[in-house]
Amino acid sequence: MGRVISFANQKGGVAKTTTTLNLGVAFSEQGLKVLLIDLDPQGNLTMSQGLNPDSIERSMFDVLVHRLPMPEVIHHAEVDLAVSSIDLAGAELALSSMIGRERALEKSLAEVKANYDYVLIDTPPSLGLLTINALVASNGVIVPVQCEYLSLRGLVQLENTLSMIRENLNPHVEIEGILPTMYDSRTLHSREAVEILEENFGELVFDTKIRKTVRYAEAPVKGTSVLKYDPSGNAAEAYRDLAKEVLNGAQAREHA
């Protein structure tokens, strides 16, 4: 049964989509079967695989709202991808009147989860119903955090949301790790931000840091991951390192 990981942070621009895609491809390089789910109405994960969300007829909106079987919206790209479309912008309103609205994704995942080792979910930059659906369906959460002070403050709100979900909807969801992104070792501000994270969250902070580089912006323009775009570059190696950390954590949990 696949392990489900959401990438969540209500602040935008923290590399959620970049991390979802590139970690998924790094897992795939290890021989693991991976499904990515684009739960963000902006559709950036879908676009990063060369697909146009505006021209997609059936998407995660139809899965969540109309109970369309998930295999019908999975495209086979670098890894399998359940796509977003512009319609997903209306999903929160449509879900709000439905019974069991927080579990729509969990129910849809049940039919495909066994086919994968990992299911990775890209969430919108909010803590609304789409993100809550992702967290309810997840075993773990990876929190990408930009290495600046204002980004750190949003972690408290996310922790509060996770506590509410544990109490009422999914007692087993846990923070898989906190990932420093946009890291620039040359600046004191970046280094201090990582220190603050480590002081407050200890071993939850990944050793891997995702550094600032234009490679992460260039790869989606080509409709591909950075691991395919620049396979031997530092940007690709960072996500291979992250994959090793996540897999080592999974092994540690199994033997705990």
Which positions does each model-derived feature cover?
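P-loop NTP-binding core
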Residues: 1-256
